[in-house]
Amino acid sequence: EHSFPTRRSSDLIVYSLYTKPYKNSTDLIKKLKSQNLKIINEQFAEKILSKISYFRFKIYLKPFLDTTTKQFKPNSTFEYAYELYSFDEDLKSILFLIIGQIEINLRTKLDQYITSHTNNSFWYLDNKYFINESKIFNTKVSLKNEFLRSKDDFTLHYKENDVNNICNDFKEMPPFWIISELSTFGNILSIFETIDKKPFTLQHNKNVLDELSKEFGANNLKELNSWLKLIRDVRNRVAHHSRVWNCNYREPHGIRQILSSDLNPTQTNKIYLFFVILEILYKNQIVDKNIQQEIKILLNNYPKTRDFIASMEIPQKWLD
């Protein structure tokens, strides 16, 4: 074993050379059994561990592990952990479809509200509508790069025939309704975060951007932006095939305050509040999947997961 001292203020951190050996599926099963994990079907377990890396799978074993003794709790099985894994995989598939619907709605309504108010289909290129010019510039560069790379028929047609007179640095760029088809969720979030509310003021203390936010069930733009950040975080975990079901997340604004006491979570940093946002979006016809029903179906398909709904902070009444 080798130690490598490093400097940090007056402290020394000692690192050890990583020496853990490779273990194949058979070795891993022996290891798990030595930790008191029951494996009902070893052939099945070997097959799973040959398709899913142990490093990835072991996070689903963690709820069954006694962290003090490093032994698995009584009656814990490999199959129960795989049930948790399968629940999470199916949940991600559902969320992928729902978030896709949200994303399409965001692009569409953003363009409808702003273009109709400004009468300018190239509004996203005009700095007068934004409060953070450097951030929106980076977004425009990102969109430009994507547009120039695109070989889609609709982009090729525009590039061969049209330009705009709104912004010389981006004169080859198309109207928002075209570029939005190439935008990432991050691009859209950047626009929502940097857009200036002042040019969108209406009579009677109303604002175009707040009215847009109400389409999604939020009270105002600030609240919607908070939701979008959480949606972005979940979307990124789904897109990278990361664990979703019991992770820590940011708390969205305005959600806990509208829930009755028996529907309020103890911890506000779990996925349940994200599910509540999806409920609101369903009621506002932004998405066509009822997340509450989808979760009930998943729990019926994977009944062992019911033992861990507290890890998602889902109140029992929400499932009744």
What annotation goes with each model-predicted range?
Residues 10-320:
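Amphipathic alpha-helical interface elements
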Residues 2-9:
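Short, small-residue-biased leader/transition segments that mark boundaries at the very start
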